[in-house]
Amino acid sequence: MAHSIGNGFPPGVFSQLTRRQLVQNGVFGAGALAVGSLGLPRAARALDEINFWATGTLDIGDDGWRTFAYDSGVKVEFTDNGNDPGPVVAKLAAGNANDIYDVAGLQGGSEKELARRGLIAPWDISQIQNYASVWQWAKDIPYLTHDGKAYGIPTVINADSIIAIRDKAGSVDSYGAIFDPKLKGKTAMEDAWINSVIFTAIYLKNSENAKIAEPGNLTADELGLVMEFLIKHKRDRQFRTFWNGWEQGLQLLANQEVWVMTGWEPIVYAARMRGVDCYYAVPREGYEGWANNTILLKSAVVRGRTKAAHQLVNALFSGFYGCKLGLLRGYVVPTDNNVAYATAHANAFDPAGVRKLADHVKQKFAGKIYWQNTRPDNFQLYETWWQRLRNA
């Protein structure tokens, strides 16, 4: 499973242990609490309240949510769900999450399972006016719909690849560098199958002519091929480690224990702040695309929160949220309303920086993309294989 920084990215935003669980950290631009509206009336009114249970990196902090509420009329009570799809699905199905929360946000792939089990409700796109501004290729993500209905709204989007230290690894343009024997002991991958398996599958499909149809949703045979490849390289001591969590990934680069690794783009910027000359490679095999999607919990419909939930999602695409999230996280909300909002509120946000961040992500998605799927058809087999890798 968030990433390029853009101008004005505050120091300190990288202090937590995991990318998907980063909590608010950083400063809000001067005058931000007084910025203009999102195009909604500002008359005194009772605020609709929504309990938003989402990945920590979607949080814009207390000051951000205050402005969001003032502009949108929706008061957000934000809770970090940890992002791991397994526990999220379990808490919705057998826990009390559906009794507590109204709207959730998590890495895409679980929507169909949740819809089939009756745990989430479809969105009424006609009630989300700003959805028309969402970039078309974000709307085309394959796992957003089920039975012709929209269950996932692509709220944050990016594409991941390889981090390399320039004076150690030279020019890297392929995932093959991770498996290059010349770099033995100086490469690493994340201890998470949702990222490391698809990276390996993308490499084998495009550079080794492996018979793999969809790297994000492997068949049992394809998964076996990929995992045997990884296990062999682990036993050969190709990898320095399989890193776990933000801090370890960053530390490996900062200490130059690792010269090349698959990882999250914000780690590049954090490592640069520590004096490491590293870069995010453009892989010829293609990027791993991912989206963090907003879903409507079934119980919110029962509690009469449907209108407020749609109002929340509409406001997420109105521009302020995208500008604020980009400033805090370097993440992109896939709408040009962000640039329009920054232009109209240049005292709070840098329009050039907002545009630069959007163009950077658009450029990635103009090339070859394979979508991350956190709930592939054989996800339980993925779990089994990954444990074998850990034990190898």
Give the role of each language-model region:
Residues 1-21:
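N-terminal secretory signal peptides
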Residues 296-366:
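Mature extracytoplasmic/periplasmic domains
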Residues 161-168, 202-203, 291-305, 324-327:
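A bilobed periplasmic-binding-protein/Venus flytrap-type ligand-binding module shared by bacterial periplasmic
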Residues 359-392:
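Conserved C-terminal helix/tail region of periplasmic/extracytoplasmic solute-binding proteins
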Residues 223-233, 274-298:
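Periplasmic-binding protein-like
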Residues 18-35:
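N-terminal export leaders
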Residues 58-62, 105-111, 115-248:
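Extracytoplasmic ligand-binding site segments that recognize negatively charged/polar headgroups
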Residues 47-113:
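Early extracytoplasmic/lumenal segment of secretory-pathway proteins
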